């Protein structure tokens, strides 16, 4: 796709909107249309002293939208609305989030409602950004529930993120930096050795600054790809070096059911872990096979039962709308099964095909559900979970998600994941350890966030650890940085 930008500074906006309509097209932003182009999808966006004009073209079909402007016109918004309406009409599609892009819609809602009022925020979302009433209601509910969690954080609060970038196998939709245990077995033990060291070193800075630990979260990857002994070592490093007296939540992703054992669960429980996530993604074996999960529905049910036997009373289950081989009946069955098990929280993601995912790279084939079906899946999950008493407490969006839809965390009241909210809202500092981890240092006065990136891959983390690892905090030892 070619997007031509003439005489205006809104190339970022129109490029983002182009990705909503054409998420898998390579988008080229140019200042003029080439004479010899072979692209069949074109957008020409231009602004003069008194008019904004957008021409949308797909093969032989063309639609032109324009609007007169003056000194007081919001030209950025007008350009975006014209672009959206032109392609929406041309393709016969509309998106419930309208022209709103960005990861954190609830945070945007917070800023508008704090600056104006909730009623004004609704009007802006609906009139300016073309957000549907359903999504308006959702974002307002999420923001309300988020506020209850955000208010728990204090000026010197922080959370700890522990990265375990290993999985049994790589799922076909995944683009995260994670390594198959089968291919990276030799890296796991030295990785854990260094992770324990980094935890201890990181704790020194947190303790010296008098920071208050609110939540601990192990992510990845699949943390339970580690052995019971390795999990115990990581947990012991945390309890030996950090004060857990203020800890509100301790979560471990036990994402792949085929990694869950009674020994690992016992190790986590004895370490004080109170919340785990067992992620089926689907309760349909054909879907699981299609996405390379290499576990069965039976294994998920068994893992959940083991977790209950081990005493876990706060279990999350993740699902993805839009997976290959899935349909609305199968998706409904998955959500209904999670609730029949009594899962305390359910997170519903929309399939997002990133560049590094196997589903994208294999022959450039995109095997996924159609947009209308995915919309129905997401709508069903909202209605069913809400009707069962679950509340939406956490939401984020990603580029290249099917239908430009959202990911939402639902929970029984009181079972929300605090870390998810703290992290997504950027409520306070997050100290992150391990390969691929990103520390977020928040200035409590200005609110400014500084990101510090650890080594991306386990082999880099291991080979370079003694050179620069964990010293990244030394430049930030004064409280004003945190």
Residue ranges and their predicted role:
Residues 25-64, 68-70, 79:
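Short, well-ordered secondary-structure micro-motifs within conserved domains or adaptor modules
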Residues 178-381:
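Conserved non-cysteine loop/helix-boundary elements of the Radical SAM core domain that shape
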Residues 27-31, 36-39, 356-433:
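A C-terminal junction/extension of Radical SAM enzymes
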Residues 471-480:
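Conserved small/polar residues in nucleotide/adenosyl-binding loops
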Residues 1-35:
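Short Lys/Arg-enriched alpha/beta "domain-start" segment
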Residues 73-114, 133-138:
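RNA-binding accessory domains that recognize and position tRNA/RNA substrates
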Residues 157-192:
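Canonical Radical SAM [4Fe-4S] cluster-binding loop centered on the CxxxCxxC motif
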Residues 90-94, 114-160, 209:
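N-terminal [4Fe-4S]-dependent radical SAM core
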